[in-house]
């Protein structure tokens, strides 16, 4: 599906960029691709990636999605875009909400506008469960990013560029996530700091995240949102699973919730469940393509949203201790950390 095509990955030196490049290299997909462009701000990470991958088809572009000219330059001749650039640390965005706005909203608008002007065929926008019923600056900014993408899709139904959104749950062992924190605390013989023991989070692997984006790329229509069905765990069970894997006697210390944290996350709202299509491992939420002339739609009717339940980390499949251990042991990151323990 990428034969002789040029791909652009914004925020390409991050967890998703590394994971999707690893997939393309491992499965020899890259031999059919014309070019992959990595667009990001950090020249050191780009240099490290360039040396590690050493592939002439992977090109590097220094720039910032906040700067329209830099993303527009990188977009010339691009066929497909994976938009992963974001500020994603919840407490940081609570203290610096304007920075979240500048990157996650205005930066996303720059990407979407450049893609439209440069006649990119398809854009996959990476979002988060925190965009559903958001209570923090990061989630609010991502929710508005989704709204920008869907609005572009609604206005461009007949245009060349297709816009789709993917929503992630917690991506295990991604940069800034809790698993690397717990492992570092175990190795340094420190207490494992847990915010709230009964707090639940969806558990996705980086492999799952790539699967979701590629599924949306292959099957997504204009304005679709895709969600992968994922199991969940409490934070306490996750910490105890890592204790067991690393044979750790570290104490667990409860420190209370951080700024902007939710007790559980939602991947699909009850309003969205009214129109969601169950695709087995995924939900597809089609765009509401109506215009502002509502009178002509009144005869259609609608499911009673009040009777539907949103899809959350509280009502999805809850993993027990042994199941979480098994899931963690399948992660390359955990295997590497075990070797170095």
UniProtKB/Swiss-Prot annotation:
Listed name of the protein: UDP-glucose 4-epimerase
InterPro entries in UniProt: CapD_C (IPR013692), NAD(P)-bd_dom_sf (IPR036291), Polysac_CapD-like (IPR003869), Polysaccharide_Synthase-Rel (IPR051203)
UniProt xrefs under CDD domains: UDP_invert_4-6DH_SDR_e (cd05237)
This enzyme's EC code(s): 5.1.3.2
Function as written in the Swiss-Prot or TrEMBL entry: Epimerizes UDP-galactose to UDP-glucose.
Homology family: Belongs to the polysaccharide synthase family.
Gene3D superfamilies tied to this protein: NAD(P)-binding Rossmann-like Domain
UniProt catalytic activity: UDP-alpha-D-glucose = UDP-alpha-D-galactose
Record's keyword terms, sorted: Isomerase, Lipopolysaccharide biosynthesis
Source superkingdom: Bacteria
Top EC category: isomerase
Gene Ontology terms describing biological process: lipopolysaccharide biosynthetic process
Family matches, as PANTHER family: UDP-N-ACETYLGLUCOSAMINE 4,6-DEHYDRATASE (PTHR43318), UDP-N-ACETYLGLUCOSAMINE 4,6-DEHYDRATASE (INVERTING) (PTHR43318:SF2)
The species this protein was found in: Rickettsia bellii (strain RML369-C)
Molecular-function annotations in GO: UDP-glucose 4-epimerase activity
């Amino acid at each position: 599906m990428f034969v002789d095509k040029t791909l652009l990955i914004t925020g390409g030196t991050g967890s998703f960029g590394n994971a999707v490049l690893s997939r393309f290299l491992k499965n020899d997909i890259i031999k059919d691709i014309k070019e992959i462009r990595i667009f990001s701000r950090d020249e050191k990470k780009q240099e490290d990636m360039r040396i590690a991958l050493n592939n002439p088809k992977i090109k590097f572009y220094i720039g910032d999605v906040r700067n329209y000219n830099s993303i527009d330059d990188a977009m010339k001749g691009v066929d497909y875009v994976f938009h992963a650039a974001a500020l994603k640390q919840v407490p940081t965005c609570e203290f610096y909400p304007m920075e979240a706005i500048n990157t996650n909203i205005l930066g996303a608008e720059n990407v979407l506008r450049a893609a439209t002007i440069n006649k990119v065929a398809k854009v996959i926008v990476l979002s988060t469960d925190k965009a559903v019923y958001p209570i923090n600056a990061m989630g609010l900014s991502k929710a508005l990013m989704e709204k920008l993408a869907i609005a572009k899709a609604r206005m461009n139904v007949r245009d060349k560029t297709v816009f789709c959104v993917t929503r992630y749950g917690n991506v295990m062992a991604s940069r800034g996530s809790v698993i690397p924190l717990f492992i570092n605390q175990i190795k340094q013989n420190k207490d494992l700091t847990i915010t709230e023991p009964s707090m639940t989070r969806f558990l996705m692997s980086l492999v799952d995240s790539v699967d979701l984006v590629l599924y949306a790329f292959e099957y997504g229509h204009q304005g679709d949102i895709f969600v992968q069905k994922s199991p969940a765990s409490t934070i306490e069970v996750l910490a105890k699973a890592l204790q067991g894997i690393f044979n750790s006697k570290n104490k667990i210390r409860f420190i209370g919730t951080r700024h902007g944290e939710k007790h559980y996350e939602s991947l699909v709202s009850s309003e969205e469940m009214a129109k969601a299509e169950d695709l087995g491992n995924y939900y597809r939420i089609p765009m509401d393509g109506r215009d502002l002339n509502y009178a002509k739609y009144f005869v259609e009717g609608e499911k009673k949203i009040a009777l539907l339940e949103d899809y959350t980390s509280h009502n999805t499949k809850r993993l027990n201790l042994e199941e979480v251990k098994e899931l963690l042991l399948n992660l390359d990151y955990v295997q590497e950390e075990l070797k170095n323990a």
